[in-house]
Amino acid sequence: MASRAEEMSPTKIEIETAVKIEEEEDDEHDSKERVLQRYFLQEWKLVKSLLDDIVSNGRVVDPTSVHKIRSIMDKYQEQGQLVEPYLESIVSPLMFIIRSKTVDLEAKPDEILEIIKPISIIIYALVTVCGYKAVIKFFPHQVSDLELAVLLLEKCHSTNSVSALRQESTGEMEAKCVTLLWLSILVLVPFDISSVDTSIADDKTFGVDDLAPLVLKILGFCKDYLCSAGPMRRISGLLLSKLLTRPDMGKAFSSFFEWTYEVLSCKEDSVTNHFRLLGVMEALSAIFKTASRKVLLDVLPIVLNDVTVLSKSNAAAKSSLLRKYLIKLTQRIGLVCLPHRSPSWRYVAQTASLSENMSTSSSQRLAPDHTVTAILQPESLDDQEDEDMDVPEILEEIIEMLLSGLRDTDTVVRWSAAKGIGRVTSRLTSVLSDEVLSSVLELFSPGEGDGSWHGGCLALAELARRGLLLPRSFPLVVPVIVKALHYDVRRGPHSVGSHVRDAAAYVCWAFGRAYSHKDMKNVLDQLAPDLLIVGSFDREVNCRRAAAAAFQENVGRQGNYPHGIDIVSIADYFSLSSRVNSYLQVAVSIAQYEGYLYPFVDELLYNKICHWDKSLRELAAEALAPLVKYEPKHFANYVLEKLIPCTLSTDLCMRHGATLAAGEVVLALHQCGYVLSADSQKRMAGIVPSIEKARLYRGKGGEIMRLAVSRFIECISLSHVTLAERTERILLDTLTENLRHPNSQIQNAAVSAVKQLVQSYLVGNDKKSVDLILKHLKHLTDPNVAVRRGSALALGVLPYELLTAKWKDIVLKLCSACKIEVNPEDRDAEARVNAVKGLTSVCETLTQKRASDPGNDDLSLFLLIKTEVMDTLLKALDDYSVDNRGDVGSWVREAAVHGLEKCTYILCKKMETYSEGDYNDDTSSLFDSNLATRLIGGMLKQGVEKMDKLRETAAKVLQRILYHKSVSVPHVPYREKLEEILPNKANLQWAVPAFSFPRFVQLLKLRCYSKEVMSGLVISIGGLQDSLRKASLVALLEYMREGEAKDPKEQQSRESALGDDILWILQEYKKCDRVMVPCLQTIEILFSSKIFLNQESYTFSFYAGVMDSLAIELRASKDFTKLKAGLAILGYIASVSHFISTKAFSQLLSFLGHRYPMIRKAAAEQVYLALLQNGILVTEEKMEKVIEIISESCWEADMETTKTQRLELCELAGLDHEVVFKTRNRLVIKDIAGNKSAADENASYSSLVDSSGF
């Protein structure tokens, strides 16, 4: 039974848990909390557990919990409203701890402060997220707390902050801020503060008019904090505004203003005084916001005078924050001067009442504007009182200061001034408000700067939002807003005005919210095209989005605007994020609706194609083309007539944009089927000769004009504009000059133009065609590298009709141009890249035309591609040229990889056109197994080298070759294995070494590919890039260990094959340091990984081959990395118990007399290690003496000393020192003899160190 009861106990526990849950659900707060935690504060459970731990312990036990809570709250910095439902649950218990601990503060001040500081950090984090107004609602506010809070502030004030960095904050600053906020609530107690201050009871000297000690303490602390640069300055100003505006604080109020007068009158120019000024201004602003008019009227003239003087001082000129506070205080002084009233003349847009609508008949249910009714209050006695209102004389000065604030250079000052204009105007009469409006409109004069326009827009928006801008003023305001929407002033290499356009869009947004449909109908008709122009064509994304938001607001609030919903769905927040998408997609879609096409065209024509930004001009010209289809006649008769004269403008921006735009429009007209008149075609044909005649390619802007002219020629060629023979020659000469230009962009644009020009005008003219080809063939060997680059590209785009006459010469010349130039001064990687691309294009052009002719059985072209082109491209894979830009040969290799792919398809397609009966020796040999092996091997080599991009390119090309859907590539050795390693999957990460190398090393098993794979692999293993070296080495070692795990014979087979491949590399790349250095480093790493140390028969032949290579490679070498790797290899071989170790040991001893001290030292280390591991090198009785000489000699000393020690070692080792010397002579003495001038070995050594990068 007992066991049965124990089995039942979990059920009992579940029942008890359910009862607890039901009890919790009865609690209204907990229920709301569970609902909110799913939708608002996602981390509430964690926060709650941390808070419960703090509350239960009465302090923060784990300091990391504070950091966790603060990190969570920081995530809600921009959405504080999500945290507000939890504030009471967080703040109340924490403040209860602070209050309870403060009671014992005098007894244990330091200990209590250490408890309060971390709690204050949490509360202050909530203040920064939710704002102080939301947080202080849950602060305790009993009368007795006032003295406790002042005591706590006194203790905190006497503690200096350890650090100002937030990450290192220990809570001093947060504790002061929280205490000041707590006092801002407590000083509002509805009793005389002197009656709360217990210290007065024992003070018999305290008089009736004296200030309570508590008040004096608070005032003293606040004055100190007003000099602070932290948040205490702002909070102390808030506290002062609450304290000094109490009815019983008249004397404190007067004394504080006397102190502020002294501060504002101080001329001291120091950092402390600057922050004191900011604090005083902030405190005065808070006081003028809180205090009653009656209290402030007495001090108002003095404060205004101080503000006027200070606004003209150097301190204000230097500090935008000070100017902001001056403007804020000025507007509040103005509000104090005027009685608070809601002006009867104000415009009010009132939403129709649902209950009223329900009570009316269905015929009268809807107002004319459907939802909003404008209310202008009728004239009454109140209006007469408004007009008779006495306006203080100082108000004019205040408004003038606010208007000057609208011209300020800083946005924060202008924004504060705009709000001040709105607030002050709301208390003025209708006549005076019109005067204010007139003054604001004066800010939009042409002579004003961008700051004035921006401030004016902000002020207009504020007036509109408050209903202070009446509809009768729209005729004056709307034209100004339209100008502001297009405000863009050029200043040097840039322009200003984006903030003005953004503010103008804000004004339009405010209009939509403030006014009824019937008042806004005509205004919206005027503003809509301009808003959409800004939304579609503005350079800045924030302006485009602001204009689109303003249009959306107006459409949503102003009723049925034509096509409004459709346009809003097109021009949304995301579609406008891309400038290209805005120009080419959004604008084109909007232009289809009535009323937008012509404004859009005019904007592009008059403002955008002459824009200072080159990319924007190009985009504007491109954007004109898709608009042509809506009104071709307008573009042909009007737009082109405007553009043609502009192509010769003295303004570079204008002529560049006009040339581009003219070409794009002509091409778009052609695509629409619109035929230009003969006169228009003649004028278009004369643009380029006119530019030539005006010599507009020279001087500033010549390069971008060449780009524009090339694009223009391409467009008119595609449009088949009628050209005279002389004009054709001029255009061709122009493009030839552009092809010679060193700028690659100009060359590429010229190549595109040549392709279309030749296709449209030179096909069929044999003489011109041959001359053109011969000229470019000659240019392929021109000393000027830019000429070679351009001609190679030009030959690649010529049509079949031109290529067929000289096809063999062209192919052979381009093959020759792909090879590395013999003269180092003539070498140019870009020329070879272009030659490879041109050669590939020529082959494609020639074969495509011939493939479409079934009667053409001539295989000479295809055989030439196989023998010459493929061989040239395979050799281009070995282009490892390097200059000051790095591995520029990689550009050639990448182009060759793509070229090989295309030529492979050409040959395989040709083979597929023949049936089995039609095969002959020539046909079957177009693509044989030998060529396939060379092709795949070359690709695989690129797939395991050090360039990430090239590895990815090679792997993807191999994938396409293996899995091409329409072309089958035959005779690929081990195709199944290749398909296993390179699966037909997209998005494989071939550029990631950890992914690609483990796959490619498996190909070392295949003897037909292993040499190429290994020759690329050693480059990666011995390279400088650490991550690449590690990934490639791990892949190789895992491959070798995998064989060992399977079968020892498999391991030996793999080692033997690997050794053969390495020996092949050593012979193939003899004296080529690019390969030899990493190859030697790879051998060293393999030896260190216990590979090739198993003393099988093949390993000894491997040792012999490596040593033969080392004898050649280390001879007269000055490469420290190479020498060090070679010595390490000799050391490993010398450690093997075989007769070959004696030879390696002898070579190591020869390096003990090397002229470089570091090499002698490295050789000595290897000799020492070899002796420890191989006992046959020296007899046992001599071993101790040899070890002693090696370890105790200074091998970095002078060479004569080291030679003596080496001689002694040779005698002890039983080696004929003359043989060793002869070996050394054969290795390095020749180099020493050839450099007798280098008498100082340290000088030579320093050069070695410099060249080695140490």
From Swiss-Prot:
Aminoacyl-tRNA synthetase as UniProt keyword: no
Similarity comment: Belongs to the TBCD family.
GO molecular function terms attached to this record: beta-tubulin binding; GTPase activator activity; tubulin binding
The name this protein goes by in its record: Tubulin-folding cofactor D
Function (record text): Regulates microtubule function in seed development. Required for development of both embryo and endosperm tissue. Not essential for cell viability. Probably involved in the binding of beta-tubulin in the multimeric supercomplex.
One BP term from GO: protein folding
Miscellaneous remark of the record: Belongs to the PILZ group of genes that disrupt, when mutated, the microtubule cytoskeleton and produce mushroom-shaped ('pilz' in German) embryos.
One Gene Ontology CC term in the entry: plasmodesma
Disruption phenotype: Embryo lethality. Embryo development limited to the formation of a few giant cells lacking microtubules but not actin filaments, each with one to several nuclei. Failure to localize KNOLLE in mitotic cells. Presence of abnormal endosperm with giant polyploid nuclei.
Database matches in InterPro entries: ARM-like (IPR011989), ARM-type_fold (IPR016024), TBCD (IPR033162), Tubulin_specific_chaperoneD_C (IPR022577)
The entry's keywords: Chaperone
Pfam family, one: ARM_TBCD
Self-association and partners: Supercomplex made of cofactors A to E. Cofactors A and D function by capturing and stabilizing tubulin in a quasi-native conformation. Cofactor E binds to the cofactor D-tubulin complex; interaction with cofactor C then causes the release of tubulin polypeptides that are committed to the native state.
